[in-house]
């Protein structure tokens, strides 16, 4: 049986290999790259509509870190100025399910739903 990190890497690879929709950008995985995959984050310019579509199709999504770090109350005093790319990305990010019990076959099925979006 795969350990949790191996399982998440396998699921992440399934997502990355099967998501093929220009409206939803998945991370690019290089070679045998491995990480812990605490989250599998994609980008969708129309995030709210995408999340609604996923929900209607039975796939839960989440938004982690919706507020960019420079806009967090504890950092306001630092006056970072405008960070338009950071703010745009914060408005686009969506986390897909990756933790157990999600399997590679589940990820491929979810990718199919994403590809029909």
Regions picked out by a protein language model, each given a short descriptive name:
Residues 1-117:
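PLP-dependent aminotransferase class I/II
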């Amino acid at each position: 049986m795969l350990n949790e990190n191996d399982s998440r890497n396998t699921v992440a690879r399934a997502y990355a290999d099967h998501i093929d929709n220009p409206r939803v950008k998945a991370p690019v995985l290089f070679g045998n790259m491995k990480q812990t995959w605490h989250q599998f984050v994609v980008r969708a310019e129309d995030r709210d509509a995408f999340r609604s579509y996923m929900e209607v199709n039975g796939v839960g999504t989440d938004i982690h870190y919706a507020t960019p770090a420079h806009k967090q109350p504890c950092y306001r005093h630092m006056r970072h100025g405008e960070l338009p790319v950071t703010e745009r990305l914060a408005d686009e990010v969506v986390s897909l399910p990756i933790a157990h019990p999600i399997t590679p076959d589940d990820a491929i099925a979810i990718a199919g739903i994403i590809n029909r979006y």
